[in-house]
Amino acid sequence: MRTGGSMGAVDVQARNNVRIAGVEGGPTIMLAHGFGCDQNLWRLVEARLASSFRLILFDHVGCGASDPSAWDPQRYESLQGYADDILGIVREFDLRDLIFVGHSVAAMMGVLVVATDPSRFARLVLLTPSPCYIDHGDYRGGFSRRDIDELLDSLESNYLGWSRSMAPVIMGAPDQPELADELTDSFCRTDPACARVFARTTFLSDNRADLARVSVPTLVIECAHDTLAPRQVGAYVQQHIDGSELVTLDSTGHCPQLSAPDVTAQAIAAFAGAT
C-alpha cells in the first residue's frame, strides 16, 4: 500500500511491517511497542485478545522488521515523527473507532496522534506511560537530568553492554529471568545507530503539556513497582487527562504485557468493551 506524505510516496505496510490479526469485524485495537522492542513483545497479549478484537500490530521505523531505508535520524529525533507514521498507518488502512494501546514511550505517541486527529480514535490506553522522565520542579519523573545523561552516555559508548545491564532493570521480573533475556535480545537486534536516536527521543522528551490535548476516553495502566514509570507518574498522567481512569496492576517492572499478560489483557479488554 502506498500513500503520499512528507516522506514522499512510501509503502506504509512495508515501512512499519504492519500486520493484522484477530477477528475481522471486531473492535479494532492498535498495539504500539516502546523503545528497543518490536511487535513481538505483544504476542502474549495478542493471543489473549485475538478471539474478541481485530488487532493492528507494527514496528516503529528502526525497530524489528521495519524498512531500514525509511530511517531518517532527523525525522525520528522527535516523537512527532513516530506519531506521524502511526497516523499514516491509520489513514492508509482507513481505521476508525480505533482503540490505541501504547506501551512506554509509545503511550506519548498515542497522546500525540489522538490530539492530532481525534476523529479516528474511540479510546486510548496508556500502558506504563511517562510524559517526562526527568524531574522538573515539583514534578517527579523519577530521574535527574544527570541520571538521564549518564544513561545515554552509557548507551552511546557501549550499546550492547548497556542492553545487557539495563534489560533486567527495565523488565523488573527477577523470578522470570527469561523475560529479561528476551528484552536483551530485542535490544541487541536493534541497530545501535537507530537505538541511540530513539533513546534520546524517549528519555529527553517532555510531553506533559500534551496530556491536556487528549479528548477521548483514556485508561492509564501502571504497575505497582516500576523503576522507569513510578506510581507518582501514573497518577500525574491520570490527573492531567480529563476524565481518564487509572488501573494499578499488582505487578513489578515496566513491561506487564510480558510479565503479567493475563491482567494486562483483561484491563485492555474491559476498557475496550469486549462482549
What are these model-derived regions, one by one?
Residues V111, A115-S157:
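Flexible "cap/lid" loop of the alpha/beta hydrolase fold
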Residues D135, Y139-F143, S154-A212:
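Conserved alpha/beta-hydrolase catalytic His-Asp/Glu region
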Residues N17-R75:
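Conserved HGGG/HGGXW glycine-rich cap/lid loop of the alpha/beta-hydrolase fold
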Residues S244-T275:
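Catalytic active-site module of serine/aspartate enzymes centered on a nucleophile-bearing elbow/loop
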Residues V214, V220-E222:
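Short beta-strand/loop motif that positions the catalytic acidic residue
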Residues H225-A229:
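Acidic catalytic loop of the alpha/beta-hydrolase fold
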Residues D11-A14, A47, H60-V105, Q266:
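Active-site loop/oxyanion-hole signature of alpha/beta-hydrolase fold enzymes
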Residues H33-F35, L98, G102-S104, C223:
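Conserved alpha/beta-hydrolase "nucleophile elbow" surrounding the catalytic nucleophile
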